[in-house]
Amino acid sequence: MARLFGTEIPNEKRIEASLPYIYGIGRSTSKRILEQAGINPDIRTGQLTDEQLTKIVQVITTDGILIEGDLRREKQSILKRLTSINCYRGQRHRRGLPVRGQRTRTNARTRKGKKKTVGAQAKKK
């Protein structure tokens, strides 16, 4: 298996489908990287030469694409900033509620967690 930026990418898949194994690179970014590097997207990852791998790494670093740890750190710092300035989005993140204006009276179960029943008690005899 080829190793790029600390991530093992499968040898048997096409390089176009293997690059998205790296956190921060999707299908469209993968196509753009291969186009800039001048590599055929249909080549299997195991068939790539060392020069082609270094060309891919060079394109990713020169384009300023955030990947792996840098991207995770960036996302975390953005969330930390939102919560520290106490804006609406930060408050929603802190409370674990939907951030982008979705309704919460019904639905939003994924974000809110398991349903907690309140107020329904059986009568004592």
Curated annotation (Swiss-Prot):
Has UniProt tagged this entry with the keyword Nucleus? no
Q: Which Gene3D superfamilies match?
A: 1.10.8.50, 30s ribosomal protein s13, domain 2
* Molecular function in Gene Ontology: rRNA binding; structural constituent of ribosome; tRNA binding
Q: Sorted alphabetically, which InterPro entries does this protein's record hold?
A: Rbsml_uS13_C (IPR027437), Ribosomal_uS13 (IPR001892), Ribosomal_uS13-like_H2TH (IPR010979), Ribosomal_uS13_bac-type (IPR019980), Ribosomal_uS13_CS (IPR018269)
Q: Where is this region: Disordered?
A: 92-125
Residue ranges annotated as coiled coil are none
Q: Which domain of life is it from?
A: Bacteria
Q: Record keywords: RNA-binding included?
A: yes
Q: Name one GO cellular component term.
A: cytosol
Q: Please state the span of the N-terminal signal peptide per the UniProt entry.
A: none
Q: Which GO terms describe its biological process?
A: translation
UniProt KW keywords = Ribonucleoprotein, Ribosomal protein, RNA-binding, rRNA-binding, tRNA-binding
A Pfam match: Ribosomal_S13
Membership in a protein family: Belongs to the universal ribosomal protein uS13 family.
What do we know about how this protein assembles, alone or with others?
Part of the 30S ribosomal subunit. Forms a loose heterodimer with protein S19. Forms two bridges to the 50S subunit in the 70S ribosome.
- Functional note: Located at the top of the head of the 30S subunit, it contacts several helices of the 16S rRNA. In the 70S ribosome it contacts the 23S rRNA (bridge B1a) and protein L5 of the 50S subunit (bridge B1b), connecting the 2 subunits; these bridges are implicated in subunit movement. Contacts the tRNAs in the A and P-sites.
Q: What is this protein called?
A: Small ribosomal subunit protein uS13
